[in-house]
């Protein structure tokens, strides 16, 4: 067998186009390509990551799922009545395929954050979680400028009799 490497046929992360996509397209992609196979119902803003007009990644943002975990970060005195909740988004789901080149995740996060800042200036910060039991320890988030606030044992998942793993928040 003979293999020829043609560097001009390889696409780089800088060629990716990031744009808002409809919820139904984002959700179908996430169900197919995210390790959990699940979407987050409160995700309202979805970015598609395209290379050569093909969808290769989706990032879904919404309000934080568990405000209780965030109280110490955004609310010290107001007992949950802090207006800062409207200044925050959570990156609820990120699903990418191998169609996209190396460093695509961090590049797409950076572009989506710039688009959010430009079009929704009230958003002051973005939160996300990395599930180290499935997809690493947050290296991509740190490479994108996120700050690691804590590492905790995930005791929120349990396995159903059919083998499916679900989060306790589903019940």
Which residues does each predicted region cover?
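Acyl-donor binding region in acyl/amide transferases
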Residues: 17-20, 62-171
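Extended charged
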Residues: 1, 9-10, 126, 165
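Conserved beta-hairpin
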Residues: 30, 43-63
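A short, polar/charged loop/turn motif at coil->beta-strand junctions and beta-hairpin connectors
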Residues: 12, 24, 55, 83-85
């Amino acid at each position: 067998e003979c293999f020829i490497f043609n560097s001009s046929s390889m696409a780089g992360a800088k060629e990716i186009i990031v744009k808002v996509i409809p919820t139904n397209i984002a959700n179908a992609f996430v169900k197919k390509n995210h390790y959990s196979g699940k979407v987050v119902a409160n995700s309202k803003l979805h970015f598609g990551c395209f290379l050569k007009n093909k969808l290769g990644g989706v990032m879904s943002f919404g309000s934080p799922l568990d405000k209780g975990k965030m109280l110490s970060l955004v609310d010290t005195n107001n007992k949950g009545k802090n207006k800062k909740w409207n200044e925050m988004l959570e990156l609820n789901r990120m699903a990418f395929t191998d169609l996209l080149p190396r460093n695509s995740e961090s590049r797409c996060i950076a572009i989506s954050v710039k688009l959010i800042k430009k079009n929704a200036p009230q958003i002051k910060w973005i939160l996300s979680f990395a599930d180290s039991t499935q997809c690493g320890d947050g290296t991509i988030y740190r490479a994108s400028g996120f700050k690691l606030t804590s590492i905790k044992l995930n005791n929120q998942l349990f396995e159903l009799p059919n083998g499916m793993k679900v989060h306790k928040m589903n019940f």
